[in-house]
Amino acid sequence: MEAKDVQISPEVQDLINKVNDIYPGKVEVQFIGQLQAGYVRHDQAQQVQDGKNILIQVADLTAPNYTASHELLHLLMILSGFPQVFFSLTTGNDQLDEQLMIMGTELYDIVNHVVVVSEQRKHNLITPEIEDLYLKGVQATIKPEPTPVDNEMTLRTLTLLDALVFFGDGHADILKQFERDYPISLAAAQKLYALIMAKPVTSPFTFRRNVVKLFKAFDEQLEAWHLPALHNTEFTTLTSVVSKRQLNLQVRQMFELYHSDMHDKTTQRRAYVGFNRADNQNAFVLSAPKPSEDTPDYYTKIYDMTVEDLFKLLKMPYILR
């Protein structure tokens, strides 16, 4: 099959229409090339900004409508006011930054997938054939666990957690296969799955809460395996979900500024992270002032501002509860 042969299904066309009803520019789905890997994986499509327009580019034609719908639903969640992740900090090591961004985005996406997969199942976009292709995608991504375990436990746990979200309950045969091939990482993934499914995602607020929970629990698991933690609560900025009352609070009432060891990506100066006092999650990043402006007054002024004024100053998006 070639890209020109792909026909958009009515369900996917419906999603394209829904997205275009909200988005001020134009959103189009574009199928590219003729590659068919023989499995589905979430890296087979991407969103590309083209001026005011967004292109959903599907680069693998194994299951083009499923893959397009997945990406469209991610976009629909953002346009509907669900929190996003931002990466404003640098460790000074480009390779490490890249790894941390990939992992942080993956954890965030897994919580997204709780909603995305539910919507796909509602619209019959996940068939037994798609489930089979998804399982093949898991097997193409992670090898069975060796004894002793290797350095791919993080990837296995992420992949299996996402698979548990995708398959949901009632796939005993697949679970048995996972138990046989990945016993240690599956046990970890099941604990994390129970955590993010304990309370349903019913709003941007509950979505954000589950992302923060997963960031923290994933680090606890890595530390239990004596692996380096990802520190997404500091490295990854997550959109704040605030009430009107909270917007009028002083910054000091809702956030605590913390002098980070990392630097602001834009200015390359030491960074201050604004942590939400309720859950210790990075809500915004400030660049340290220039030496000439580095006075106690500088920080007092920031703490004295209202939350709304600070977000305006930083051009930081927020979501109203």
Positions of PLM-derived features:
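Short pre-active-site segment immediately N-terminal to the catalytic Zn-binding motif
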Residues: 52-68
